[in-house]
């Protein structure tokens, strides 16, 4: 019998393996394949927003001052949407509108589409980052799935809604006061607060806040006593087998308070995940409906009776009148190019609506 000893030739890593090794290397800030999408898009979205709020006016698109350079502050500065006449143009810097002129591109509202599209892809990249890291450390992907809620809301409000309307003009501008104005617009033109999907969204978000507060307080209240006084951060070993807090005590407490309580940690934490994510998704679905101009609840019988009987009025009919006032003032202000003229008798008159 002959035994031959020799070296097995080592195959050289191809480009993919080399990139995979570098991208997924254990470092202080994980990069990963998702980072190729996340980091550039987040950088450009934030950079575009800071640039716009610092230097760029909205005079040419909305007739407004919207930058620190013009005297706005953090609450009133914004990167505003393009003009209504530009419809759904992507407003590329090299496109037919700006023709490579950066100043003209900013004046036309090009920074808004730049921030919106890069922001959407940055959020998707962050979700993929959570998937990638979860797979690397062998976790379930619920963090990434939960983050689909904020992504759905962003995409529906900033992209799908204006796509259903006549242009990007009707999307929210990126600023605090600008978002508030958009909320008022949603109420006046869509009666958003009476939309069942908005109601489910509010229930989900506020319900999640309540659950979070209750859960945090309950865990704090039932932490097992340790030998380090009030400081529990050094007393428990991360690899300990026993519980850090008493689920049995917590269950007994809430059973006495409400009559019912969670007896299973998995169901409890899944419920805390389910409530806010479902609320955000319901809100997103509702905004998609508004993009198609679907109406909220209409209680026509109350409106007819209120019109016929001056002594009959409900909170609903009062809100409908307020919505009419919002529309009458907002439409003429926001869309001067439409030359909307309302007779004096239909315009709100101060407090005398």
Swiss-Prot record:
InterPro entries named among the record's database cross-references: D1/D2, Photo_II_D1/D2_sf, Photo_RC_L/M, Photo_RC_L/M_CS, PSII_PsbD/D2
Gene Ontology molecular function: chlorophyll binding; electron transporter, transferring electrons within the cyclic electron transport pathway of photosynthesis activity; iron ion binding; oxygen evolving activity
SUPFAM superfamilies tied to this protein: Bacterial photosystem II reaction centre, L and M subunits (SSF81483)
Enzyme class, UniProt record, top EC level: oxidoreductase
Binding-site positions, pheophytin a: 130, 143
Subcellular location: Plastid, Chloroplast thylakoid membrane
Protein name per the record: Photosystem II D2 protein
Gene: psbD
Source organism of this protein record: Lolium perenne
């Amino acid at each position: 019998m002959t035994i031959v000893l020799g070296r097995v030739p080592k195959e050289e890593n191809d480009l993919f393996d080399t990139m995979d090794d570098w991208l997924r290397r254990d470092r202080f800030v994980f990069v990963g394949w998702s980072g190729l999408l996340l980091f550039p898009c987040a950088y450009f979205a934030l950079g575009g927003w800071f640039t716009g709020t610092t230097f760029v006016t909205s005079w040419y698109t909305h007739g407004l001052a919207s930058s620190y350079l013009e005297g706005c502050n953090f609450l009133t500065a914004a990167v505003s949407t393009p003009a209504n006449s530009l419809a759904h143009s992507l407003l590329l810097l090299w496109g037919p509108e700006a023709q490579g002129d950066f100043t003209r591109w900013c004046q036309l509202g090009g920074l808004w589409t730049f921030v919106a599209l890069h922001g959407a892809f940055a959020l998707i990249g962050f979700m993929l980052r959570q998937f990638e890291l979860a797979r690397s450390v062998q976790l379930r992907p619920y963090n990434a799935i939960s983050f689909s809620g904020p992504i759905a809301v962003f995409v529906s409000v900033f992209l799908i809604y204006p796509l259903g309307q006549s242009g990007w003009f009707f999307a929210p501008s990126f600023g605090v006061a600008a978002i508030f104005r958009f909320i008022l617009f949603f109420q006046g033109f869509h009666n958003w607060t009476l939309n069942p999907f908005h109601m489910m969204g509010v229930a989900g978000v506020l319900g999640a806040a309540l659950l979070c507060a209750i859960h945090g307080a309950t865990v704090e209240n039932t932490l097992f006593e340790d030998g380090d006084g009030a400081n529990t951060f050094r007393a428990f070993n991360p690899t300990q087998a026993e519980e850090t807090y008493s689920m049995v005590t917590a269950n007994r407490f809430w059973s006495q308070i409400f009559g019912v309580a969670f007896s299973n940690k998995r169901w409890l934490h899944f419920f805390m995940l389910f409530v806010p994510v479902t609320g955000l998704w319901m809100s997103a679905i509702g905004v998609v409906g508004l993009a198609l101009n679907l109406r909220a609840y209409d209680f026509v019988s109350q409106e007819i009776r209120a019109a016929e009987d001056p002594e009959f009025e409900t909170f609903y009919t009062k809100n409908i009148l307020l919505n009419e006032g919002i529309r009458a003032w907002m439409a003429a202000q926001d869309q001067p190019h439409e030359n909307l003229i309302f007779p004096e008798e239909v315009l709100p008159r101060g407090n005398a609506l």
